[in-house]
Amino acid sequence: MAKAKFERNKPHVNVGTIGHVDHGKTTLTAAISHVLAKTYGGEAKDFSQIDNAPEERERGITINTSHIEYDTPTRHYAHVDCPGHADYVKNMITGAAQMDGAILVVASTDGPMPQTREHILLSRQVGVPFIIVFMNKCDMVDDAELLELVEMEVRELLSEYDFPGDDLPVIQGSALKALEGEPEWEAKIIELAAALDSYIPEPERDIDKPFLMPIEDVFSISGRGTVVTGRVERGIVRVGDEVEIVGIRTTTKTTCTGVEMFRKLLDEGRAGENCGILLRGTKRDDVERGQVLSKPGSINPHTTFESEVYVLSKEEGGRHTPFFKGYRPQFYFRTTDVTGTIELPEGVEMVMPGDNIKMVVTLICPIAMDEGLRFAIREGGRTVGAGVVAKIIA
């Protein structure tokens, strides 16, 4: 059976379900799949297909994730659902599944629970920009006042973590009843889909963002000058553009005088392409791997930041022992390792393999970074953790 042709005629948006264990994330995922397939066409995925999440490896970390797709009249969605809490933590920190928005599932029979809070905090730390709430199991609550109380509680919790709790959409429904085909509850799934369409703005495509290319290699070509190679992370670079070389050393400006791909000369290099960029008047020794080439003023070098980190377990090939304050591993950003020191939160003495933890990192030399940048923590080339820049300090 040939795979269906991927049509790019609709904007593509990445979403996912988050929330406490057993609040109905996977059931909701199945319900969305069924109701939208029934209403707008497409393939419906069963609960068992979604629940049996395949194992993936991202930066050496084992994560179980289910990916499903569905359509509304105006958009195409890719949706991730994870079976276990640890999978969410790993997924969000490594950016294995970057979300343009998340659906927070809260059982109205329980109200917000510890992982509800933790997933909201993680969403804030890793930069999930929008959250929509689906209050599940509303068929099991007869008291309208109780539903109102749970909704207020969820909204307050979201506001506590700087999400617009008073303004974001909250849909009251029942994933199970919708999955069983009861029209009044199916209507709530359509309402949820409409909220996704209207509340989550269309994500800016990588190609429309300011140009950035991590430098992987530097060559000098006699008679032509210095060429840096790498994969363009975002934006477009055109011949004649002014660019900055950022990170590790003092930021310098130069001009792109040529773009090459597969030995062919081009006018421009675009997001996702591997290319060589010829720099005017730049010496071979002025640039090194680990720096980035970027649109002037679009990114700055920093050394100190707050991060959210997942420490690999022993089974994942991580450390066998905890680490303490004063730990000095390497932090791998894009293409290079930089040594740094860590500061643990107050009251935390040690960090065990398998933990996730907030820490302040100070690097020995500056790296071009924005909030949301992912990194690995390594010891002698072996990955022992994964992290994300949550807040830049200096």
Swiss-Prot record:
Compartment annotation: Cytoplasm
Region (G3): 81-84
Enzyme Commission designation: 3.6.5.3
Main subcellular localisation: cytoplasm
Single GO cellular component term: cytosol
Annotated GTP binding sites: 19-26, 81-85, 136-139
Family that this chain belongs to: Belongs to the TRAFAC class translation factor GTPase superfamily. Classic translation factor GTPase family. EF-Tu/EF-1A subfamily.
HAMAP family from the UniProt entry: EF_Tu_B (MF_00118_B)
PANTHER family xref list: ELONGATION FACTOR TU, MITOCHONDRIAL (PTHR43721:SF22), ELONGATION FACTOR TU-RELATED (PTHR43721)
Name assigned to this protein: Elongation factor Tu 2
Organism this protein belongs to: Shewanella sp. (strain MR-4)
Lineage: Bacteria, Pseudomonadati, Pseudomonadota, Gammaproteobacteria, Alteromonadales
